[in-house]
Structure formats: C-alpha cells, structure tokens
C-alpha cells in the first residue's frame, strides 16, 4: 500500500507541475502548437486518470477478493492513463520525425483534431463515472468502448503518415550522421 501511495504522490506532483507549467498552444496552430496541444492533452488525461483512480478506490467495496478489488479499482483510471501514454507516444513519433528530417504528410490541424478526439474521450470518462457505478458492467464496457473509439483512431492515422514520410525520407538520399540515431529510434518505435 505504501508503494502505491508514493507512486500516486509522484504522479500527482508530475501532473500538477504539468498543469501549472504547460506551454501555451498559441493562436496559430502550426506543427509546434499542435505538439504542445498533444502534450497538454496528455497532462489533462493524467489529471483525469488520477481523479478516476481516487474515485474508484473510494467507491469499490473493500470486502471483495483482492484480484476483483484491484481490477475494479484500477480499471477506469488505467484506461484514462492509456490515453495519456498514447498522446505522448504520438507526440514523440512526430518530434522524432521532425528532428530526423522526415516530412510527415499530415496537416497540424488533422493531428490536432485526432488529439482532440482523444481528449473528448478522456472527458467522457467523467460522464461514465457519474452515470454508472464503478462496479457495474456498463462502467467497464463504456471504458473499453472509449478506448476503442477515442483511443484507437489516432494511432493508425498518425503511424501511417509517419511511415509514409519515413519511406520517402529513406528513398530521398543519404541521411545525415546526426539524424541517424533519431531516425533509428523512430523506426523501432513504430
């Protein structure tokens, strides 16, 4: 139990720092602004995940068998946390692509829209928590559905765009020595 509290405190401090120190997206939605939006969306997802964890821990009956207790206690928050990780992964792909000279054939607005859909799914989690008990089948099904719809939409689109840009970059001639490690990291992360 103590380890979970230390982990939760660390996560809460990280999210709080992110919320108070996150860079502004800006008025003009260019590539950098879109990436800032993605990072900010991940921070918000982390905050909602922490709220979901606390809510679930308070709502799940303590007299359940240990496996059932922990599954119910961490189901909703865990799904929301996956949104944060996915957003950060997508931002990392786009950053690595840019840093290694890969031109990704997708507009910043489309990427921002995909990030926004994930953020809407994160906010929909609060509706699931308000509408259904944490121990209900509906709660679990809707959390899974949110991951399938909101979470899975951006991954193939951005991965395909990065892969296409990567293929074009590799065919375009030799890669500068300083970009090779970044390009390798991008390739193995896809």
Features from the language model and the residues they span:
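Hydrophobic alpha-helical transmembrane segments of multi-pass integral membrane proteins
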Residues: 1-190
């Amino acid at each position: 139990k103590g380890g979970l509290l230390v982990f939760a405190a660390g996560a809460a401090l990280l999210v709080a720092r992110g919320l108070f120190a996150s860079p502004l997206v800006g008025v003009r939605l260019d590539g950098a602004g879109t990436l800032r939006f993605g990072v900010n969306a991940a921070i918000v997802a982390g905050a909602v995940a922490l709220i979901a964890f606390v809510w679930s821990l308070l709502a799940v009956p303590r007299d359940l068998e240990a496996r059932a207790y922990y599954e119910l206690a961490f189901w909703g928050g865990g799904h929301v946390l996956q949104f944060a990780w996915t957003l950060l992964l997508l931002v990392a792909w786009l950053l690595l692509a840019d840093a290694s000279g890969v031109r990704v054939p997708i507009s910043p607005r489309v990427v921002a829209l995909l990030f926004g859909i994930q953020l809407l799914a994160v906010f929909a989690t609060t509706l699931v928590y308000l509408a259904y008990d944490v121990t209900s089948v509906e709660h679990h099904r809707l959390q899974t559905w949110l991951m399938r719809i909101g979470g899975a939409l951006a991954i193939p689109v951005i991965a395909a765009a990065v892969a296409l840009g990567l293929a074009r970059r590799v065919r375009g001639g030799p890669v500068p020595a300083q970009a090779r490690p970044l390009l390798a990291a991008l390739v193995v992360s896809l």
